[in-house]
């Protein structure tokens, strides 16, 4: 089956926003107007099509990014729905990696909220061109122009209005298109009927003012338009569209539209803008990767004639078909039933079926082409971030980096039957989500699960119960502390066993050095002249990493250390991988004790929004929680306090904040970095831990 839509008529887009900006409702409306859904779902009724996991429907938030395909004006639009809650930033990163463009949805009242900033920065990192949609124009306090100012101040963006609203709050009834200088007024409730009219008198002045701003902004990015503008010549709508498209794709501007998805106003012009201004796979630079054999950089252009390569960006377990692997195809063609090569894992896999995902049903397809997004069944070894390619033309695409989990809880199965199923459930969930980690506490034998926040772990436990029918008891949340060192040391490790027959001999000299925060782990091999044979070097590395799982202070994982192997010796007969692993692990533990080990704790970036009168109490409380206040600003009539606070001090904060502000304060927090724990606090933690 040849490709249905040419590449230039394909759009891979994400919809990104803060919780409650109305992202899921906007997606729903897009599916309704493009004819994929016949009755609209409402989030607060729990029937929205994109929120297809049961918990999402209960909580009214979007957790997993479902990929959906729809059509508009002869274009295929693949939508990746991204979650807006801070515990799920990894889902957002993961979807941005495979998108070509995005719609950023803002609430007309809240404007740029903390999560919007995070998501915006993530989109900057992956250089994703975007258009902005100011939603909820019908609610009290809606202010379109205020949101544009906030986008400039907070995001450092260059927002350019291509519409202005007609009316606001309950009088919001349509928009002025600043390209055609015509008004679009919505007549019926479903928003399917709209009239194009002359601009009403009450918005004429503001429309004129913003039309000039639009022309000036476009002229800055396009010389031809600049000349025409300065000479007072007529600029056609087509010329303007082409210039805005170019500037958007080059990240020079963000076109801004407005509407009210819930009231069905403004969604069709938003779809037009996706087609008019967001890039197709052809407009995006060739994807870069490297050869697994030589390590040199390779490019793959978005074309069916290039060798096949794709990125697995999401794994999901589906009750009917088992494991679904979502793929973004960058080049070439993949047929259902064919073999692919997983270059990340160095394994061949067979693709059983290929599915095109619609919001609530799926269709089997024979093949996928460069630029497409699909789900594959049958890839048992593939995990998130793996590259799939043609075996004769191997390439590894840059993988995604995922943050380390910051919070953990102990869980235990309620019954013997649960125990057997628990392992399988945890393994499946960890496959889907790289920020969810499982470990065992060797002293107590407890299973620990770690994630990005309390909500993240609650949802994991909930899914175990619903999808895998596993009941577990959950302990109190604990902070995921880490250990590191403060000074450099050189240390020797020897492991020698002689007792009849073949002995064991491993001998290493290591240097341990501290790295800056977030430096992770580096292993440097400085062995010269073969004092330790090449084949034992990986064992030394493995031994060190094994020892790093459990630090010398309190058994927490060790981070931010460079380990250099600079000397040692071996025995012709007795040396083995195991002997070098043990010698390296012993040396590391010994060295760490001498290198001034310290505890590290996760520091959260916290933003608290409170009415003015509670300001003093709330700030006092943040200081009492060892918080560092970074800054304050007025937002509307509320004060926003930005601070860095250790996660250990944030448990139960929601309840405290509610009681201090009579339920009027809100806060968001997300992991920012690790920092050394003050000595007096560290002593208490170690005392508790080592009891």
Curated annotation (Swiss-Prot):
Sites where the protein binds GTP: 17-24, 81-85, 135-138
Entry's Gene Ontology BP terms: ribosome disassembly
Molecular-function annotations in GO: GTP binding; GTPase activity; translation elongation factor activity
Subcellular location: Cytoplasm
Keywords, sorted A to Z: Cytoplasm, Elongation factor, GTP-binding, Nucleotide-binding, Protein biosynthesis
Alphabetized InterPro entries for the sequence: EFG_II, EFG_III, EFG_III/V, EFG_IV, EFG_V, EFG_V-like, EFTu-like_2, G_TR_CS
SMART domains registered for this protein in UniProt: EFG_C, EFG_IV
Occurrences of domain tr-type G (ranges): 8-282
GO cellular-component term (any): cytoplasm
Xref: PANTHER family: RIBOSOME-RELEASING FACTOR 2, MITOCHONDRIAL, TRANSLATION ELONGATION FACTOR G-RELATED
Family under the similarity heading: Belongs to the TRAFAC class translation factor GTPase superfamily. Classic translation factor GTPase family. EF-G/EF-2 subfamily.
Function: Catalyzes the GTP-dependent ribosomal translocation step during translation elongation. During this step, the ribosome changes from the pre-translocational (PRE) to the post-translocational (POST) state as the newly formed A-site-bound peptidyl-tRNA and P-site-bound deacylated tRNA move to the P and E sites, respectively. Catalyzes the coordinated movement of the two tRNA molecules, the mRNA and conformational changes in the ribosome.
Listed HAMAP family: EF_G_EF_2_B
UniProt-recorded name of the protein: Elongation factor G
Origin organism lineage: Bacteria, Bacillati, Bacillota, Bacillota incertae sedis, Caldicellulosiruptorales
């Amino acid at each position: 089956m040849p490709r249905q839509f040419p590449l230039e008529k394909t759009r891979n887009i994400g919809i990104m926003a803060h919780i409650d900006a109305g992202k899921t409702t906007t997606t729903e409306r897009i599916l309704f107007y493009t004819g994929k859904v016949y009755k609209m779902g409402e989030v607060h009724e729990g029937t929205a099509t994109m929120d297809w996991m049961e918990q999402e429907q209960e909580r009214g938030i979007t957790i997993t990014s479902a990929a959906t395909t729809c059509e508009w004006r002869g274009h295929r639009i693949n939508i990746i729905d991204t979650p807006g809650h801070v515990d799920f930033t990894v889902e957002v990163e993961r979807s941005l990696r495979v998108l070509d463009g995005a719609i950023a949805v803002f609430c007309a009242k809240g404007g740029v909220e903390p999560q919007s900033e995070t998501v915006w920065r993530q989109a900057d990192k992956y250089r994703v061109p975007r258009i902005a949609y100011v939603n909820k124009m019908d609610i009290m306090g809606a202010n379109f122009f205020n949101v544009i100012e906030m986008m400039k101040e907070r995001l450092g963006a260059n927002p350019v209005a291509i519409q202005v609203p007609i009316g606001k709050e309950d009088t919001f009834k349509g928009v002025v298109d600043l390209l055609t200088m015509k008004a679009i007024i919505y007549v019926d409730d479903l928003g399917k009927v709209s009239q194009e009219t002359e601009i009403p008198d009450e918005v004429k002045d503001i429309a004129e003012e913003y039309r000039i701003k639009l022309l000036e902004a476009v002229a800055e990015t396009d010389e031809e338009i600049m000349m025409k503008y300065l000479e007072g010549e007529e600029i056609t709508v087509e010329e303007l569209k082409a210039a805005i498209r170019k500037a958007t794709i080059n990240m020079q501007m963000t076109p801004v539209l407005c509407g009210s998805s819930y009231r069905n106003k403004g969604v069709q012009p938003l779809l037009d803008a996706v087609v008019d201004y967001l890039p197709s796979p052809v407009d995006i630079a060739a994807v870069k990767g490297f050869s697994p054999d030589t390590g040199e950089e390779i490019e793959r252009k978005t074309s069916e004639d290039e060798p096949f390569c794709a990125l697995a960006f999401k794994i999901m377990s589906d009750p009917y078909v088992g494991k679904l692997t979502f793929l973004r195809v960058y080049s070439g063609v993949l047929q259902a039933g064919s073999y692919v090569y997983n270059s990340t894992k160095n394994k061949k896999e067979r693709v059983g079926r290929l599915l095109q995902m619609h919001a609530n049903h799926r269709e089997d397809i024979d093949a996928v082409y460069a630029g497409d997004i699909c789900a594959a069944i049958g890839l048992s070894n593939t995990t998130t971030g793996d590259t799939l390619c043609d075996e004769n033309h191997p390439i590894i695409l840059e993988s995604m980096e995922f943050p380390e989990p910051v919070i953990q809880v102990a869980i235990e199965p309620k019954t013997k039957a649960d125990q057997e199923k628990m392992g399988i459930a945890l393994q499946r969930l960890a496959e889907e989500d790289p920020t969810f980690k499982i470990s065992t506490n060797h002293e107590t034998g407890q299973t620990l699960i770690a994630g990005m926040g309390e909500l993240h772990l609650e949802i994991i436990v909930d899914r175990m119960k619903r999808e895998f029918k596993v009941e577990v008891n959950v302990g109190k949340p604990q902070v995921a502390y880490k250990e590191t060192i403060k000074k450099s040391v050189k240390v020797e490790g020897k492991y020698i066993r002689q007792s009849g027959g073949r002995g064991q001999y491993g001998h290493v000299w290591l240097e341990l050095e501290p790295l800056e925060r977030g430096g992770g782990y580096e292993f440097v091999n400085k062995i010269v002249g073969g004092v330790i044979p090449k084949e034992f070097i990986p064992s030394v590395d493995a031994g060190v990493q094994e020892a790093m799982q459990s630090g010398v202070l309190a058994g927490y994982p060790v981070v931010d250390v460079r380990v250099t192997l600079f000397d040692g010796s071996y025995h012709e007969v007795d040396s083995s991988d195991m002997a070098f692993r043990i010698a390296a692990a012993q040396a590391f533990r010994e060295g760490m004790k001498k290198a001034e080990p310290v505890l590290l704790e996760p520091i959260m970036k916290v933003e608290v929004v409170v009415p003015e009168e509670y300001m003093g109490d709330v700030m006092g409380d943040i200081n009492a929680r060892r918080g560092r206040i970074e800054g304050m600003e007025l937002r509307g009539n509320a004060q926003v306090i930005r601070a860095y606070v250790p996660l250990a001090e944030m448990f139960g904060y929601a309840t405290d904040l509610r009681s201090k502000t009579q339920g009027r304060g809100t806060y968001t927090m997300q992991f920012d970095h690790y920092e050394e724990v003050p000595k007096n606090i560290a002593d208490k933690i170690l005392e508790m831990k080592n009891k």
